[in-house]
Amino acid sequence: MTKNVKKNIKDEINIIVTNLALSKNIKLDEININIQKPPKSDLGDISILIFELSKTLKLPIETISEEIIKALKAKYEIKAMGPYLNIKIPRKEYIHNTIQMVNAQKDTYGTSKYLDNKKIILEFSSPNTNKPLHVGHLRNDVIGESLSRILKAVGAKIIKLNLINDRGVHICKSMLAYKKFGNEITPEKAFKKGDHFIGDFYVQYNKYAQENENAEEEIQDLLLKWEQKDASTIELWKKLNNWAIEGIKETYKITNTSFDKIYLESEIFEIGKNVVLEGLEKGFCYKREDGAICIDLPLDSDEKTDTKVKQKVLIRSNGTSIYLTQDLGNIAVRIKEFNFEEMIYVVGSEQIQHFKNLFFVSEKLGISKNKKLFHLSHGMVNLVDGKMKSREGNVIDGDNLILDLMESILPEITQKIENKENAKKNALDIALGAIHYYLLKSAIHKDIVFNKKESLSFTGNSGPYIQYVGARINSILEKYNTLSIPIIKKINFELLEHEKEWDIIKIISELEENIIKAAKDLNPSILTSYSYSLAKHFSAYYQEVRVIDINNIDLTAARIEFLKAILQTIKNCMYLLNIPYMLKM
C-alpha cells in the first residue's frame, strides 16, 4: 500500500486510541501502531496488530478492536481476527490514483525526501593499479553504484569517491617485472587494455620471485628509490599507473559506474602523519622508546592478555606510516572538503578489524567528531574451488567475465538482430544485467559463488528475466500504438477488475517504501526481490489476460495505462540496481 493510505489509516487509529485512552483516564506516553501485510491476500490489504495497543492501554484486545471497527467501518471493510484487524482498501479509487500517479511521475515515481538532503559520502571500488578489476571489484562497484542511486532516491545528497591505490610494494612488483621483461612494449603494441597489460607483469613477478631469492630485496630497493623520488623510477611508475588507470576507467564506463571525485593515494598518503603528530601534541597518542608513535586500542572480547589495551603503531620508528594512518588523513581531508554528515566505506569483510580500529582512533584523536563513519562490509565472490588469488593469475577477471557472458548469448541474439553492433550492444546489456543482478540479489554480508548459468537465466530470479519482462511490456505497448484504435480521452480504470490486476497494483504502490527500506538497511537486495516479485506477477497476469482486445477498446485502454505503470516501476527499479533497460530482446 502507498505511504499515504497507510499514514491515513495510522493517523485515524491514533485519534481513536487517544480518545479511547482519554475516556478511560489512561495516560499515554507513546502509541505504537504496527501495520503489517496479511499472510493471505484474501484476508485484506493491511493488517493492524492490536496486541501491542492492548498492552499499552491495558485494555482487552476485543475492546480496542470494537472501537476501531466502529470508527472505520464506513470507509473500509474491516474485520477482527484474533489479535489482528484486517482492512480492505476501496479498490476502484486506489487503482485509478496509483496508475495516474505512476504515469505522471515517471522516472521520479518511488522517490521521497526521507533523508532530506543529508550529505553522505560513499567510498567504493578502491582498486590497485597493478591488475584489472576482478569480479570481487564488480560486486563492490555495483553495491556502491546501486546504493548511491537508492540513497539519492530518498533525498540524500550523495558524493561518490574512489581512492585508487597507486603506490607501495604491490605496485613495485609490476614495475620490477616490467623493467626486467617488458622490453619497452606498450599496451597498444600488445593489443591489451592497460590494466590487463600491467596485471600480466604482476603475475610474472610472482613467478620470478619463486625462482629468485633476492626478489624481495629488489622490491625494497625499488620502493626506496620511489620514496626518494628517483627520476627514472618515478617516470616508470607514472607510465605504468597511467596505463592501468586508463584500463580501469574503461571498465567503469562499460559497467556504468561513476564517481564524483577520484583520489590517488600517492597524492594524499602523507597527510595522515600530520594528523597523528597533532594528536601526539594533544596527548592522544604517545611516542615509544624506539621513536614509533602509538595509540592504545581496546581489546576485542575474544582476545586474552594481561593488559586491558593493545598497542597500535601509527608512525613507525623509521618515519613511515601504516594504512590506518593514511586513512585518518583521508577522513580529515574529506571533512574539510565536503563537510559530510556520514561516510560509508563499501569494502570487503576482510577489512572489518581495520575499520573498527580506524573509527576508534579517529574518534579518539577528535578527527571525526559529530560525523558518522560506517563500514559496509560485503562478502567475497569465490571461484568454485575457493577464494580468488590474483598473484597466481587464478582469478575471475571482471572484463573477461562480461565478455564470456556476452559470447554465451550472442549466437541467440544474432538470430534476431542482423546488425552486428546492435547485437553486441544487446549482448553487453544482458551480460551486465546478469552480473549486476546476481551480485546484488544475495545479502551483502554473504560470500557468493558466481554461477554463470544461473545468472543468465531468462526464466528465474535473474537480471535477464527482469530485462525480458520489461522488453515484453514495451513490445505490447508498441504493438498497441500501431493499431488503428480510437483514442479514449477518459480512461475508465473501474474496468480493471481482475484479481491479478489488484495484486499488481498493490506491489506497484509499495515501491517507495521498498526504496526507503533498501536505503535504511543499505541493502539493494530488497529491490532485486521486489523487482522479481513484480515481474513474476506480470508474467502470471499476461498468461491469463488478453491485454489488447479491439472489440473492447475501453478495457484495452485501461489495461494499456496499467501496463505503462508496471513498466515504469520496473524501469525505475532497474535504474536503481544499475541494470540496463532494453526496448527489445
From Swiss-Prot:
InterPro entries, A to Z? aa-tRNA-synth_I_CS, Arg-tRNA-ligase, Arg-tRNA-synth_N, Arg-tRNA-synth_N_sf, ArgRS_core, DALR_anticod-bd, Rossmann-like_a/b/a_fold, tRNAsynth_Ia_anticodon-bd
Q: Primary place of residence?
A: cytoplasm
Q: Name one GO biological process term.
A: arginyl-tRNA aminoacylation
> Do you know which Gene3D superfamilies this protein is assigned to?
Arginyl tRNA synthetase N-terminal domain, HUPs, Isoleucyl-tRNA Synthetase, Domain 1
Query: What keywords sit in the KW lines?
Result: Aminoacyl-tRNA synthetase, ATP-binding, Cytoplasm, Ligase, Nucleotide-binding, Protein biosynthesis
Looking up Pfam families in the UniProt record yields:
Arg_tRNA_synt_N, DALR_1, tRNA-synt_1d
Offer an example of a GO molecular function term for this protein.
Answer: arginine-tRNA ligase activity
Q: Tell me which domain of life the UniProt entry assigns to the organism this sequence originates from.
A: Bacteria
Instruction: Please name the PROSITE patterns in this protein's record.
Output: AA_TRNA_LIGASE_I (PS00178)
Q: Which CDD domains match?
A: ArgRS_core
As its record notes, the protein acts as a catalyst of: tRNA(Arg) + L-arginine + ATP = L-arginyl-tRNA(Arg) + AMP + diphosphate
Q: GO CC terms on record?
A: cytoplasm
ATP-binding in keyword set: yes
Q: Which residues form a coiled coil?
A: none
User: Does Aminoacyl-tRNA synthetase appear among the keywords?
Assistant: yes
Q: Which SUPFAM superfamilies match?
A: Anticodon-binding domain of a subclass of class I aminoacyl-tRNA synthetases (SSF47323), Arginyl-tRNA synthetase (ArgRS), N-terminal 'additional' domain (SSF55190), Nucleotidylyl transferase (SSF52374)
Q: Where are the transmembrane segments?
A: none
- Where can the motif 'HIGH' region be found? 127-137
Location comes to: Cytoplasm
What does the record give as EC number? 6.1.1.19
This protein's assembly is summarised as:
Monomer.
- HAMAP family, A to Z: Arg_tRNA_synth
NCBIfam families cross-referenced by the UniProt entry: argS
Protein family: Belongs to the class-I aminoacyl-tRNA synthetase family.
Q: What is this protein called?
A: Arginine--tRNA ligase
Q: Which gene underlies this protein?
A: argS
